[in-house]
């Protein structure tokens, strides 16, 4: 099938990763043309050129889902969050989520011990092979995104179908946090896995992405 005949899968990774994060998932998505935004944690940011005439399924992992809601770089036909959230930290009327103080401590410690903070976060995610080089200032800037962004209103305004894939054992985005963010807004499909579903269970994710697209 020619690229012009295939829908486009738009992928955005989360904090501490890069465009290569989705490679295990992309291997299962041959019926899509896959393009990936790179947020610049390991080098220069990469923003693909979008064709507004193409049909898009947008997929954000973790913070990448908030990035899509905030920036909406192209009109899409469906939106999927994996291990995702519309807001990362707790606030009045929104809990459970990550305590504000936890993120404040990460921000305070980051410029003094960026390697340690990054490695600790990756270990919590279940990733024992964190990036071996990264842009400290860009990573610190994106910690502020996690602290400040609140895309609940953007999610409520979303006009296209929204789907959520979540891990029952996710140590970053707990099941209760997932439900707080999406209950009554989007259907949630659960896997027993943790925070890195696209790399740990790419076939499972691919099946659900394809089913979501077919349902549009």
Residue ranges, per PLM feature:
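Short beta-strand/loop motif that positions the catalytic acidic residue
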Residues: 158, 164-166, 170
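Short beta-strand immediately N-terminal to the catalytic nucleophile in serine-hydrolase-like folds
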Residues: 58-60, 82, 165
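Flexible "cap/lid" loop of the alpha/beta hydrolase fold
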Residues: 73-109, 136, 141, 145-148
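Gly/Ala-rich beta-loop-alpha elbow adjacent to hydrolase catalytic centers
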Residues: 59-68
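Conserved alpha/beta-hydrolase catalytic His-Asp/Glu region
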Residues: 109-156
